[in-house]
Amino acid sequence: MKASDLLVRCLENEGVEFLFGLPGEENLDVMDALLNSRIRFVATRHEQGAAFMADVYGRLSGKAGVCLSTLGPGATNLLTGVADANLDRAPLVAITAQASLDRRHKESHQYIDTLSMFKVVTKWNAEIARPQIIPEAVRKAFKVAQTEKPGATHLELPEDVAAEQVGAVEYSKPLRVQLPFKPEPLGGQVKRAVQVIAGARRPVILAGNGVIRGRAHEAVRRFARSLNIPVAQTFMGKGIIPDTDALSLYTLGLQARDYPARVFEQADVVIAVGYDFVEYAPCFWNPNGDKHVVHVDVSPAEVDAHYIVEVGVLGDIALCLDQIGASLSPSDALWARRCREAIVTGFEQELASPPAWPLRPQHVIRELRAALSAEDIVICDVGAHKLWMARMFPCEAPNTCIISNGLAAMGIGVPGAIAAKLLSPQRRVVTVTGDGGFLMNSQELETAMRLNLPLVILVWRDDGYGVIRWKQQLRFGRTSSVDFTNPDLVSFAESFGAAGYRVTESSELRSVLADALNCGRPAVIDCPVDYSENLKLTERLKSLT
């Protein structure tokens, strides 16, 4: 058995379903070994697409997504998606080929120090310098990637090592996969948290992506409902509590004084559950550092002058909340009701005006929500549309609106939708993207066609980098190099064999969405959007009292 065969056997042992990547010269042995494997290799049109697919697979499944590249340019192309997974706390294992050991001491074709490059965007990385260490290296890569806080790991496999025969029998078997245990909180931590929360007059819960990773959303709902404490979610925490719930404060994350931010201004105790600074810094919701913070998570709190923890309760999030909640009485329901009413009123006012042309972001969101069921999946690319979707797209369940908010790399939308559809073929999948993000990885439309994946790509077109235009206008009152032209997006889609649609008036979007969702193949919708609403939103939020 060759080392490449052992590598594939170890990946199978970890339960790998899909391997996203590109074949190359230095990974020939690995590609050949995959022919005899149950792992499905998904050939992408760019390594960045492969890394984004592994990234979103990890977010949705909780299991490490795996991506593969050759050396040199293949490895550098993976880098952005790997970094995105690492900051979005998505478990991912990247495997890159490398030059043979006998040419690493000198200048060599396509050889670069890949280990050093990946070190800064992963939790752990290593070179497989001998076939015998493959079982240990693979097991550690998956264990580290999937352990809180999850993220990316990287393995480098030199070409000559991949082709070597594995020697002794004891080195030719994968290591046993051990499931993580659920750590229980310490009694003293729980008791102190109960004291702090019991003394609160205006408590609020800030729930982050750690809740979803820990499959603890039901525990958050129980805790909030039993105690009448309102819940705000981070962008990556959407769906922890249904937005239709009377305790939902929607999402906190816009770097402006949005409606939920006013609740945090009045709150005296913030119960931060699975909250991650990488999404939304504490200085935005605790500018004076004077809130009493109860930190509930598997991991200790990060150090921050605006996040002075009164008590940290460390352990499995669901166990922590259930134990804290068991010793508390309900808060005043009037506080929670007033918080919710103020936010709902604000959003209703935004939706009150009749649809205009081009469509306003709020109305695109309303039509999209109406077209989808609660369990369908939306993958949101990065741009101005992300801010609108995070604020206003209602979710009933976790992992139904995936937003990249750590590294926040543009271009994740189309590859992410492919991963979501492969993982959940029975659910409808829509990517919401801007014309900037779409063209960064639009080549993966061919991958979707080849795999026969019926998914919808809703392109909010404004012929520019909308969120940067918004910020330039706010800061300088003018713009700089943010405008561009686009191809005919309908013809572009059709050139791949996909369906192409164009919205030409506000009343068409609902029927176009229905047609695209039911066409049975990948579809692209060109939807012009009026982003003058961005500045109007800023002015509206400034006027809040």
PLM region descriptions:
Residues K140, V144-G199, E348-L351:
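Conformationally flexible catalytic loops at phosphate/diphosphate-handling active centers
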Residues I39, R59, N209-V294, E396-Q426, ...:
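Glycine-rich, anion-gripping cofactor-binding loops and their flanking helix/strand elements
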Residues Q132, A168-V169, G289-K386, S506-D515, ...:
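Phosphate/pyrophosphate-binding active-site segments
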Residues I95, R103-Q110, V303-L314, A318-I324, ...:
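Thiamine diphosphate
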Residues T96-A137, G237-C339, P487, L513:
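Glycine-rich, acidic loop regions that bind phosphate or pyrophosphate groups
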Residues E17-F20, R40-V42, L60-A99, L206-N209, ...:
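A short, small-residue-rich loop immediately preceding and capping a beta-strand
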Residues L7, E12, N27-M31, L35, ...:
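Active-site diphosphate/adenylate-binding microenvironment
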Residues L6-V16, V56-S61, N86, V144-K149, ...:
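Glycine-rich phosphate/diphosphate-binding loops that line cofactor/substrate pockets in enzymes
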